[in-house]
Amino acid sequence: MRDVAIIGYGQTKFGELWEDSFRDLIVEAGVKAIKDANVDGGDIDAMYIGNMSGGLFVGQEHIASLIADHAGLNPVPCTRVEAACASGSLALRSAVLSVASGHHDVVLAGGVEKMTDVEDATAAIASASDQEWEAFFGATFPSLYAMMARRYMYQYGLTIEELSMWSVIAHENATKNKYAQFGFKTTLEQVMNASPVADPLTLMHCSPVSDGASALIVCDADKAEEFAPKDEIIYIKASTQASDTIALHDREDMTTLNAAKVASEKAYKLAKIAPEKIDVAEVHDCFAINGLILVEDLGFCKKGDAGKVIDEGKIRIDYDDFVTVNPSGGLKAAGHALGATGIRQVGELYWQLKQDKECKDRQATIKNGYGIAANVGGTGGTVCVHLLSDKR
């Protein structure tokens, strides 16, 4: 298997982008990535695009053909990848495997979602849950994650203040990200006193409905220096995936994402490092409780200790003796354009590890040169992990 490198990244702003169409968004992100990578359209061997539900959100299926056409890249093969909110990272994983296998040399991995054109986005998103045993009975993702939060609070003594601090830190980081949907600060009191959604979660514990797109250019590591300076090349040391039950009630423990534990353990093994070597992480905080759970499941602290870690501010950008988590603002504040999220997470790590000017105001301390991203589909039925390094 060949080593795989990232040589370019581009994204749109995330938010309610009324004037931009579905096709406008992915073309903008793709063009930015191609320019950043210093490649031509003719260099692209294939494209993999993550999209959860173009059919429900904008009435458009067969998006692979649409994107190749509107990007001006026909007849380059383009494949749409779907795994709920993990669609983007699985598109990247497909791209990584195609390059590592030697089948392709230069590949575009992208993600896109246009969520604000549908009347009831919550119902559309619920299609990623178990339709017979969850959605049929009225369960939505806010209610499912609320059950996870309530159980975690009961089992480990997590306080509402500790849970809410996650959102406070996320918004603080997002003020330094020009692409973020919610680039404003908030307070503990504002988070706790926001409109209730599903007890114990308020609106400010939840990620928003977002439009947006993101794209990465990956290539054979031996070819990377043909396009990018050596100090601007970031290497994908591991791309792993694991599955779990789609329905929350079938899990042995709803306070952990077993697929995240399995996928991250595989990633650490492939990269031959321990969790302590990670400098920066982007985790899937679709709801604040999931951020805390992933901090534990990725091995950054013991089970039940995440609340204390968050309350002490250890995940903050300016805290040197712990992994920096979600410097972008995460899904909570940067936005969650479903199919684009997994790519955006890895794009943030790409910027962070090469200490790019794009993240100069939110730059994490890079000591060991490693970053990890965990992208979750549903309530953890699918998890994809990417581990990056600034060293080959």
Swiss-Prot record:
Residues at the active site: C85, H336
InterPro entries recorded: Thiolase (IPR002155), Thiolase-like (IPR016039), Thiolase_C_2 (IPR055140), Thiolase_N (IPR020616)
Residue sites binding CoA per the record: C206, S207, V209, K332
EC number: 2.3.1.9
GO biological process: isoprenoid biosynthetic process
Pfam families in the cross-refs: Thiolase_C_1, Thiolase_N
CDD domains: SCP-x_thiolase (cd00829)
GO molecular function, one term: acetyl-CoA C-acetyltransferase activity
The UniProt record lists the keyword Acyltransferase: yes
Pathway the protein takes part in: Metabolic intermediate biosynthesis; (R)-mevalonate biosynthesis; (R)-mevalonate from acetyl-CoA: step 1/3
Top EC group: transferase
Reaction equation(s) it catalyzes: 2 acetyl-CoA = acetoacetyl-CoA + CoA
Alphabetic keyword roster: Acyltransferase, Isoprene biosynthesis, Transferase
Family designation: Belongs to the thiolase-like superfamily. Thiolase family.
Subunit structure and binding partners: Interacts with HMG-CoA synthase (HMGCS) that catalyzes the second step in the pathway and with a DUF35 protein. The acetoacetyl-CoA thiolase/HMG-CoA synthase complex channels the intermediate via a fused CoA-binding site, which allows for efficient coupling of the endergonic thiolase reaction with the exergonic HMGCS reaction.
PANTHER family: ACETYL-COA C-ACETYLTRANSFERASE, ACETYL-COA C-ACYLTRANSFERASE
Function: Catalyzes the condensation of two acetyl-coA molecules into acetoacetyl-CoA. Functions in the mevalonate (MVA) pathway leading to isopentenyl diphosphate (IPP), a key precursor for the biosynthesis of isoprenoid compounds that are building blocks of archaeal membrane lipids.
Name under which the protein is recorded: Acetyl-CoA acetyltransferase
Organism, as annotated: Methanothermococcus thermolithotrophicus
